């Protein structure tokens, strides 16, 4: 499997969808995927090990998006599928169901989906960008609404290859993922109708700069769906962790609700609305057989679950919607 296999059909991003700059970007990525090494080679082999079959059913509009049923595969193919999927661990987002195999990911992402799915604009015929798309769980949930295009950006190769594993069987021709960070994405002014940015902004050293770039890539009147760590406060407060937050070194700014609204307005958005505030619990994020790393329980103070191990407030996430003006 090489670049040609991974990016098959991606020329449509320019030729059909008129998203400029993609062909040059794919050419620049060629050495990584044409001559894979390390984990990239490992994940390439995992994809090559997936059994070749056509799923008799594809049902993406459910908590665990489903491809195929048990009887679609022989016993040997089932073993082959399980081994290939397991080689792609850790699976952070899910759950999924592959031909009767229940893939219980670290995050029960359906919980987050249910918080906002009924409170945002319908995605039908829209051009959608998902920043930090991971393995595409939310992209596959979006697919049932028949968007014109969904483009995910995911620089972590683990999750990028997981997306291809799912879509090998889901066969969603209008879903695309690029293995790049948001910074590497050219500013396609006024292109996207809806942008999702979930669990990304607090990793940024310049959150306002990121919000401004998102704004510039959106149609006037387009909708931003933003999920972020927050402080449950209406004061002008922002937490800047001294070193780590919940054992994460790359967390920089955790704003209060009021500060988050101010950032969005300063970046050119209006009609800012906070549609959900939720404490992250072990029912939503926990260790499973499909990850080999720590999870939420390990990040909280064992003597006071309302604090992280560093002594900061435990993770609370809020979902905001806003309109580009």
UniProtKB/Swiss-Prot annotation:
HAMAP family: tRNA_carboxymethyltr_CmoB. The keyword tRNA processing applies. Carboxy-S-adenosyl-L-methionine binds at residues 93, 107, 112, 132, 198, 202, 317. Keywords: Transferase, tRNA processing. Catalyzes carboxymethyl transfer from carboxy-S-adenosyl-L-methionine (Cx-SAM) to 5-hydroxyuridine (ho5U) to form 5-carboxymethoxyuridine (cmo5U) at position 34 in tRNAs. It is an enzyme of class 2 (transferase). Signal peptide: none annotated. Its EC number is 2.5.1.-. GO terms for biological process: tRNA wobble uridine modification. It catalyses: carboxy-S-adenosyl-L-methionine + 5-hydroxyuridine(34) in tRNA = 5-carboxymethoxyuridine(34) in tRNA + S-adenosyl-L-homocysteine + H(+). It comes from the Bacteria. GO terms for molecular function: transferase activity, transferring alkyl or aryl (other than methyl) groups. It holds the Pfam family Methyltransf_9. Belongs to the class I-like SAM-binding methyltransferase superfamily. CmoB family. Homotetramer. Transmembrane segments: none annotated. This is tRNA U34 carboxymethyltransferase. It comes from Desulforapulum autotrophicum (strain ATCC 43914 / DSM 3382 / VKM B-1955 / HRM2).
